[in-house]
């Protein structure tokens, strides 16, 4: 039943875009960000050469320069608010996100977000005067957001893509929280969020190298689900099929290939131990979100005062960044974002019939009235498999019965466009 799932070969359009990503541009952006001395959220904001204010203004100017090639499709705003005294915020401070929006040409109401944070820190999270280059954490992610903005400014995505450099991450995810809250309060349909944080090095603290892998951290059962829904998810074995994990599977399917030169290693966790990231506020807001992070971290080069002790160099210095690796991570992000944007939206109200004891699987969903949707595809895998292994195109219908036991498989349904692009799968709940 069905056929083996085959990862789609990247089309010429995606190949052309990812080839535009320049390691030299990545290096130039990171070098400039490091030159501001510190980008600590609490650092000064009235200088043109030093502190987070200088970094903010330079990022915004560059983004606006890119927008000049967009024929009006890209807009750039500096989204700011004053954060009152709070955890890691000893005095009121203005937190600013630089947000570039490439408006979709056909479905502008469907939105995808990619972020990197441009603030930095040293050992003491409250030290806002010492130099904090933050070359890897997270000038690397910011550089990817900016490089993608440069490239996408010249394209016409079907859906809207937001590329943001956010602040306040090191103090408590404040900038990303404000961005996610703003989108949520305006009822924006964000169908996917990618967070790039610490994506600049291919070498770990023991010298281990893996220059062709990026980790994708994906949360299990969503924290926003009610107790009733969470209990039902566990009852039916859906703990590994959260929207975040479907997004991670999608990224692995479309962006782990010879064009990007990368493997996407899905990690079934919200984040690393003792760490957090800007995807979390988006998850809390109910949006599918994942975090990309390099495979082997060197903690001597994160959150450290600049110093040398016993021959060991500490600090997040630019000399430890692998620009070619960072560019490849950018290719993964671009391939994922573009594939999401060009595919139809995810199917709605996907359910599985569990009212009778039998060995069939009956699935239902709402048929989209969009002419961009050509059909729907059912995908499935064994309960112990990480990725989808089988697929069956069932046409543009709203239900299907398969002679496969729902007890033995995990099922999903995804939309297929007239352009053959496929959405992330949606896991069915009983209904």
UniProtKB/Swiss-Prot annotation:
CDD domains xrefs: M28_like
Binding site for Zn(2+) 1: 117, 137, 197
Gene3D superfamilies documented for this protein: Zn peptidases
Highest taxon in the source lineage: Eukaryota
Metal-binding listed as a keyword: yes
Glycosylation sites: 46, 185, 258, 310, 349, 359, 369
Necessary cofactors: Zn(2+)
Record InterPro entries: M28_fam, Peptidase_M28
Domain Fibronectin type-III: 344-431
Enzyme category, top tier: hydrolase
Pfam name, any one: Peptidase_M28
Main location group: secreted
Alphabetic keyword roster: Glycoprotein, Hydrolase, Metal-binding, Metalloprotease, Protease, Secreted, Signal, Zinc
Cofactor note: Binds 2 Zn(2+) ions per subunit.
One annotated Gene Ontology cellular component of this protein: extracellular region
Similarity section: Belongs to the peptidase M28 family. M28B subfamily.
Protein name: Probable zinc metalloprotease Lema_P086240
């Amino acid at each position: 039943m069905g056929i083996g799932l085959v990862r789609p070969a990247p089309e010429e359009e995606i190949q052309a875009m990812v080839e535009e990503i320049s390691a030299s541009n990545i290096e130039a952006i990171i070098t400039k960000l490091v030159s501001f001395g510190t980008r600590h959220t609490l650092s000064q904001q009235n200088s043109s050469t030093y502190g987070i204010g200088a970094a903010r203004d330079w990022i915004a100017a560059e983004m606006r320069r890119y927008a000049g090639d967009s024929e009006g499709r890209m807009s750039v705003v500096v989204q700011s608010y004053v954060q009152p005294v709070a955890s890691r915020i000893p005095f009121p401070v203005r937190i600013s996100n630089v947000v570039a929006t490439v408006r979709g040409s056909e479905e502008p109401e469907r939105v995808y977000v990619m972020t990197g944070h441009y603030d930095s820190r040293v050992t003491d999270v409250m030290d806002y005067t010492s130099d904090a280059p933050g070359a890897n954490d997270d000038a690397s992610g910011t550089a990817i957001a900016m490089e993608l903005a440069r490239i996408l400014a010249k394209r016409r995505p079907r859906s809207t893509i937001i590329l943001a450099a956010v602040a306040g991450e090191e103090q408590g995810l404040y900038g990303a929280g404000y961005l996610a809250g703003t989108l949520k309060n305006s009822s924006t349909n964000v169908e996917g969020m990618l967070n790039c944080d610490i994506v600049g090095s291919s070498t770990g603290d023991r010298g281990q190298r893996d220059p062709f892998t990026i980790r994708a951290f994906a949360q299990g059962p969503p924290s926003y689900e009610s107790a009733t829904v969470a209990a039902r998810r566990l009852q039916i074995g859906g703990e590994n099929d959260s929207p975040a994990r479907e997004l991670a599977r999608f990224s692995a399917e479309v962006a782990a290939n010879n064009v990007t030169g990368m493997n996407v290693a899905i990690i079934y966790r919200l984040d690393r131990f003792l760490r957090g990231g800007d995807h979390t506020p988006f998850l809390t807001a109910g949006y599918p979100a994942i975090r990309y992070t390099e495979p082997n971290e060197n903690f001597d080069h994160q959150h450290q005062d600049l110093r040398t002790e016993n021959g060991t160099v500490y600090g997040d210095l630019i000399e430890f960044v692998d620009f070619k690796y960072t560019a490849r991570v950018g290719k993964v992000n671009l391939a994922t974002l573009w594939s999401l944007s060009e595919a139809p939206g995810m199917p709605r109200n996907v359910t599985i019939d569990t009212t009778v004891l039998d060995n069939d699987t009956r699935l239902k969903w709402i048929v989209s009235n969009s002419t961009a949707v050509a059909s729907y595809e059912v995908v499935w895998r064994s309960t112990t498999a990480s990725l989808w292994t089988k697929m069956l195109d069932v046409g543009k219908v709203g239900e299907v019965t398969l002679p496969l036991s729902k007890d033995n498989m995990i099922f999903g349904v995804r939309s297929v466009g007239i352009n053959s692009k496929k959405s992330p799968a949606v896991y069915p709940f009983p209904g």
